[in-house]
């Protein structure tokens, strides 16, 4: 059996001791994600399964629903925004992305179905309830390493990054069909993908904008932008934006700063933040924080300095002790969690002088 530390599924600066969760997986756990309300925990493993636990009073249930649909290790899971119901996506070494919907008693009470009835997404209605496979995306020819749901203001959109070098963008249409855009992102392989906030920093979104297409909004509402970042085996992070003129995603920036594969990329939520923040983690044992002061400004980078966090850090400047596999922002976008190959998770905050400091450290 395999356990996962609950603090790895969400960010906290409290001194409370992390809780170990017995997942009942039979092999290594690769990802653990809480849903929007923190009421469910999804995990995935090399045992080819996804498990979903209910969270009661901060403690996961001892039993889980097990989802079978992959023929290889499952690398990542991602919850859709509750606007679209109880939707969970998973991606695997088998080259598939599976989208699941919970039609059972555990489904969110009052969850809206903006694209129709409970059988939205083309899911068959099931009186027996439980999780249903509503979409199996098989376009990729190699491992799908990362998935990311777009901000809900843009609609039901899922980006998928693959070792075949492509990022596919799945969009659910009002007629129940799925549209696919294929982006040739990194020729030697794509490791991660992350959506940017739907609006530029400091903008406010009207509730009436939900589900609107990207572009200028009427009545003074904020302009919505479809933009995501991809991380590749070419040591590069690329930023893509949907062009209305070309009717496709176009590359708007290529960020060079790492000397080895970029393992993860994460846009920070920009609620109340004055600029755009993007974190990248690499095989070269560094984490870079990229900032952009305005949509037309150049991106600047700052490397985290783990030496201040641990004397055991590597001898090289700004090097972590091992490969950095994951970076994840808090909901407010002001705290960054860094997961390193040495088994440690560190939390970082920017101080008033603009320097990044390690504020917490824990063993995974």
Curated annotation (Swiss-Prot):
Please indicate if the UniProt record lists Protein transport as a keyword: yes
Where composition is biased (Polar residues), the residues are 1-11
Q: Name one Pfam family in it.
A: WD40
Task: Please indicate if the UniProt record lists Mitochondrion as a keyword.
Answer: no
Extent of the WD repeats: 24-63, 69-110, 139-180, 185-250, 257-300, 319-358
Kindly list the places in or outside the cell where this protein is found, as annotated in its UniProt entry: Cytoplasmic vesicle, COPII-coated vesicle membrane; Endoplasmic reticulum membrane; Nucleus, Nuclear pore complex
Spell out the residue ranges making up region: Disordered.
1-24
Q: Please give one Gene Ontology molecular function term for this protein.
A: structural molecule activity
Which InterPro entries would you find in this protein's record? Answer: Sec13/Seh1_fam, WD40/YVTN_repeat-like_dom_sf, WD40_repeat_dom_sf, WD40_rpt
Location (main, coarse): membrane
Q: Which SUPFAM superfamilies match?
A: WD40 repeat-like
Q: Name one GO cellular component term.
A: endoplasmic reticulum membrane
List the keywords (alphabetical): Cytoplasmic vesicle, Endoplasmic reticulum, ER-Golgi transport, Membrane, mRNA transport, Nuclear pore complex, Nucleus, Protein transport, Repeat, Translocation, Transport, WD repeat
- Name the membrane topology term: Peripheral membrane protein
Question: What are the recorded Gene Ontology BP terms?
Answer: COPII-coated vesicle budding; mRNA transport; positive regulation of TOR signaling; protein exit from endoplasmic reticulum; protein import into nucleus
Q: What PANTHER family does the record tag this protein with? A: NUCLEAR PORE COMPLEX PROTEIN SEC13 / SEH1 FAMILY MEMBER (PTHR11024), PROTEIN SEC13 HOMOLOG (PTHR11024:SF2)
UniProt lists the family membership as follows:
Belongs to the WD repeat SEC13 family.
Q: How does it assemble?
A: The COPII coat is composed of at least 5 proteins: the SEC23/24 complex, the SEC13/31 complex, and the protein SAR1. Component of the nuclear pore complex (NPC). NPC constitutes the exclusive means of nucleocytoplasmic transport. NPCs allow the passive diffusion of ions and small molecules and the active, nuclear transport receptor-mediated bidirectional transport of macromolecules such as proteins, RNAs, ribonucleoparticles (RNPs), and ribosomal subunits across the nuclear envelope. Due to its 8-fold rotational symmetry, all subunits are present with 8 copies or multiples thereof.
Primary role: Component of the coat protein complex II (COPII) which promotes the formation of transport vesicles from the endoplasmic reticulum (ER). The coat has two main functions, the physical deformation of the endoplasmic reticulum membrane into vesicles and the selection of cargo molecules. It also functions as a component of the nuclear pore complex (NPC). NPC components, collectively referred to as nucleoporins (NUPs), can play the role of both NPC structural components and of docking or interaction partners for transiently associated nuclear transport factors.
Q: What is this protein called?
A: Protein transport protein SEC13
Species name: Mycosarcoma maydis (Corn smut fungus)
Source organism phylogeny = Eukaryota, Fungi, Dikarya, Basidiomycota, Ustilaginomycotina
């Amino acid at each position: 059996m395999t356990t996962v530390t609950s603090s790895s599924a969400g960010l906290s600066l409290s001194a409370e001791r992390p809780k170990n969760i017995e997942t009942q997986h039979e092999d290594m756990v690769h990802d653990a994600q809480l849903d929007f309300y923190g009421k469910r925990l999804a995990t995935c493993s090399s045992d080819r399964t996804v498990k979903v636990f209910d969270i009661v009073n901060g403690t996961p249930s001892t039993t889980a629903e097990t989802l079978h649909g992959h023929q290889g290790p499952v690398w990542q899971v991602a919850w859709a925004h509750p606007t679209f119901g109880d939707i969970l996506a998973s991606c695997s070494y088998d080259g598939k992305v599976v989208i699941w919907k919970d039609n059972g008693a555990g489904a969110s009470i009052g969850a809206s179905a903006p694209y129709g009835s409970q059988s939205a997404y083309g899911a068959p209605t099931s009186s027996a309830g439980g999780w249903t496979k509503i979409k199996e995306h098989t376009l990729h020819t190699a491992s799908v390493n990362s998935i990311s749901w777009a901000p809900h203001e843009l609609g039901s959109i899922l980006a998928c990054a693959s070792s075949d070098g492509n990022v596919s963008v799945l969009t659910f249409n009002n007629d129940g069909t799925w549209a696919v855009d294929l982006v040739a992102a990194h020729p030697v392989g794509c490791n991660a993908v992350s959506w940017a906030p739907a609006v530029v920093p400091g903008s406010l979104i009207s509730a009436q904008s939900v589900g609107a297409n990207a572009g200028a909004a009427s009545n003074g509402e904020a302009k919505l932008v479809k933009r995501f970042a991809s991380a590749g085996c070419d040591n590069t992070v690329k930023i893509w934006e949907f062009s209305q003129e070309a009717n496709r995603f176009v590359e708007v920036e290529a960020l060079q700063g790492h000397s080895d594969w970029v393992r993860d990329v994460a846009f920070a939520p920009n609620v109340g933040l004055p600029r755009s923040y993007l974190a990248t983690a690499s095989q070269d044992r560094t984490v870079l924080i990229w900032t952009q002061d305005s949509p037309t400004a150049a991106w600047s980078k700052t490397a985290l300095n783990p030496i201040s966090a641990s004397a055991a850090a590597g001898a090289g400047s700004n090097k972590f002790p091992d490969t950095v596999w994951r970076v994840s922002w808090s909901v407010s976008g002001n705290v960054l969690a860094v997961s390193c190959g040495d088994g440690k998770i560190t939390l970082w905050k920017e101080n008033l002088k603009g320097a990044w400091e390690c504020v917490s450290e824990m063993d995974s």
